[in-house]
Design a protein with these regions (language model features):
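Active-site-proximal beta-alpha core segment in soluble small-molecule metabolic enzymes
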Residues: 2-5, 9-13, 17-19, 30-133
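Histidine/acidic residue-rich metal-binding segments in metalloenzymes
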Residues: 22
Length: 133
């Protein structure tokens, strides 16, 4: 092994472990639903491979950061429920409707903006003090 090959970073993604971890978490739930967050290309692991693995494990609810990520995920998982963290913007209404994506409403203004378009379902973010958005 050359010095250069030892210094090259490498990531090994074990899809079997992702599936096992999902199934373990799911087994601990009662009267609850487990969802997966796949923003930023599944945190750099590869959205297609991770999404398909989780879907085969039984996951059908996903969260992504942006509308573009949601559209990409819709191509991979046509029947999944997909939420978009970055909220609702009326100029993107057509895409939310076409791709059956659900915005997470992050402010009173976004709720007001969404009301005329409320034929698409949305989620509401409640600030619990974690300051994650």
């Amino acid at each position: 092994m050359s010095l250069d090959s030892r210094m090259t970073p490498r990531v090994t993604i074990n899809l079997s472990s992702i599936r096992s971890n999902y199934k373990l978490l799911e087994s601990k739930l009662s009267n609850s639903v487990l969802a997966s967050v796949l923003k930023a290309n599944a945190y750099g692991l590869g959205i297609e491979r991770v999404a398909l693995t989780l879907s085969k494990a039984g996951c059908n609810i996903f969260f992504v950061a942006t509308l573009d990520e949601g559209i990409e995920l819709r191509q991979i998982l046509p029947k999944a429920t997909i939420y978009i963290f970055h909220g609702f913007f009326s100029e993107s209404y057509g895409d939310y409707r076409k791709y059956k994506l659900k915005p997470i409403l992050n402010s009173i203004d976004q709720i007001r903006d969404w009301l005329p378009y409320s034929d698409i379902m949305a989620g509401i973010q409640f600030d619990t003090g974690m300051l994650r958005l």
